[in-house]
A protein has these predicted regions:
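Short cysteine-rich clusters marking metal-coordination/redox-active sites
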Residues: 53, 72
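Rieske [2Fe-2S] iron-sulfur-binding subdomain
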Residues: 1-46, 80-189
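Beta-loop-alpha module in the N-terminal Rossmann-like domain of NAD(P)-dependent dehydrogenases
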Residues: 42, 59-62
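Short Cys/His-rich "knuckle" micro-motifs
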Residues: 61-64, 81-83
Length: 189
């Protein structure tokens, strides 16, 4: 088909649910063809770095979390969530260029989210906090379900705005009509 492949739109993408990333854990997650090292520090802060150590390219997800940093499995260089090298065990000083590439991250509404823009531009909007899902005002645990769809992001978005097709094509019960408000990149319905 001439429509494929679609470009990946820019915006915030879910890397994992917050409860899936325990303190001291590292996961390799691929976003838009790029491998990322997603980790939670010992104090509980989520962070995301390019998965490959800037020293010699070792996969950081195969390392371990030490305090507030991830330690490379090859030479034990350590990088914090801001990409700063915090330790080189055999060096007296850390070179200025020893910096891991970071990805903008937000942890909100029970999800660890990363920003993607094909031209590397910084985020131009924050994700809204949903009342009742965060911190002190959290009133209930969410239920989670993973669904794998053999499709692309654009088709998911197109289907979301074509509510009528669910009833006629997929033979699902009709959705109740709701008011939809679009405020910049945010859709509320």
């Amino acid at each position: 088909m001439s429509r494929f492949p679609f470009p990946i739109p820019h915006g915030w993408f879910g890397l994992c649910f917050s409860h899936e990333l325990k303190a001291g854990e590292i996961k390799k997650i691929t976003l838009a063809g790029r491998d990322l090292a997603v980790f939670r520090t010992e104090s509980g802060k989520a962070a995301v770095l390019d998965n490959y150590c800037p020293h010699l390219g070792a996969p950081l997800h195969q390392g371990c979390v030490v305090g507030e940093s991830v330690r490379c499995p090859f030479h034990h260089w350590q990088f914090n969530g801001d990409g700063e090298c915090t330790d080189i065990p055999y060096a007296n000083r850390i070179p200025a260029r020893a910096v891991a590439e970071t990805i903008p991250l937000q942890e909100v509404n029970g999800m660890v989210m990363a920003w993607y823009h094909p031209e590397g531009r910084e985020p131009y909007f924050e994700l809204p906090k949903v009342e009742g899902l965060n911190g002190e005002d959290k009133w209930n645990e969410l239920e989670y379900m993973d669904i794998e769809l053999p499709t692309c992001v654009q088709e998911v978005a197109e289907n979301d705005v074509d509510q009528a097709h669910f009833t006629y094509l997929h033979r699902m019960p009709a959705f109740s009509e709701t008011e939809t408000v679009v405020d910049g990149p945010i859709k509320r319905s």
